[in-house]
């Protein structure tokens, strides 16, 4: 029995609310159970120096946690003077995941910066961030379309992107781990996938004991089911 009493293939209660920030070109409040992340997408007329003059744009991401997003206060990274390795890893993952389905040529010489701020953390902050980031990005691109900022007719967003965690808890493959499950899991993995089921990235770790190929395939099957549900929710959020 899972601590949450969910079925092995059951997501937490998920909500995606688009357009929650007044000033941002795109935004989304994403909730995976008790994990809450505020995501904004900002359009900027600037590019990394190495991209200037190439006629294409860029999508990048930043990630952070509020001090009391966790059970005990976490020191702000700004006060420490640097980001920790986990933060850098996660924000690079978010950026890579979003760029996988964006037509950067169609975007033109512009940058969209996606900020993911964790308000409350109960496991799966990176997967919630990616799922909400796509909605905020779609919101931003929709804002640009209403202002005729694209020259061609080709879609700038070629597909959805969503992410979910899976793990082996008490010998059973389960979907969408919360903190209680994640901290006790034998294995945990994060899957980032497109709307049509293609894989963008997989991160898997044996926390206690190595896992078999069959167990991995069971986790991937759960992830595909979970991502399909998340994509449905994304489509409803941006409709």
From Swiss-Prot:
Annotated SUPFAM superfamilies: Ribonuclease PH domain 2-like, Ribosomal protein S5 domain 2-like
Gene3D superfamilies assigned to the protein according to its UniProt record, in alphabetical order: GHMP Kinase, N-terminal domain (3.30.230.70)
Domain of life: Bacteria
UniProt binding sites for phosphate: 86, 124-126
Keywords in alphabetical order: Nucleotidyltransferase, RNA-binding, rRNA processing, Transferase, tRNA processing, tRNA-binding
Coiled-coil ranges from the UniProt annotation: none
Known catalytic reactions: tRNA(n+1) + phosphate = tRNA(n) + a ribonucleoside 5'-diphosphate
GO biological process, one term: tRNA processing
Stated role: Phosphorolytic 3'-5' exoribonuclease that plays an important role in tRNA 3'-end maturation. Removes nucleotide residues following the 3'-CCA terminus of tRNAs; can also add nucleotides to the ends of RNA molecules by using nucleoside diphosphates as substrates, but this may not be physiologically important. Probably plays a role in initiation of 16S rRNA degradation (leading to ribosome degradation) during starvation.
PANTHER family referenced in this protein's UniProt entry, alphabetically: EXOSOME COMPLEX COMPONENT, EXOSOME COMPLEX COMPONENT RRP41
HAMAP family: RNase_PH
Subunit structure: Homohexameric ring arranged as a trimer of dimers.
The family this protein is said to belong to: Belongs to the RNase PH family.
Official protein name in the record: Ribonuclease PH
Organism: Rhodopseudomonas palustris (strain BisB18)
Gene this protein is translated from: rph
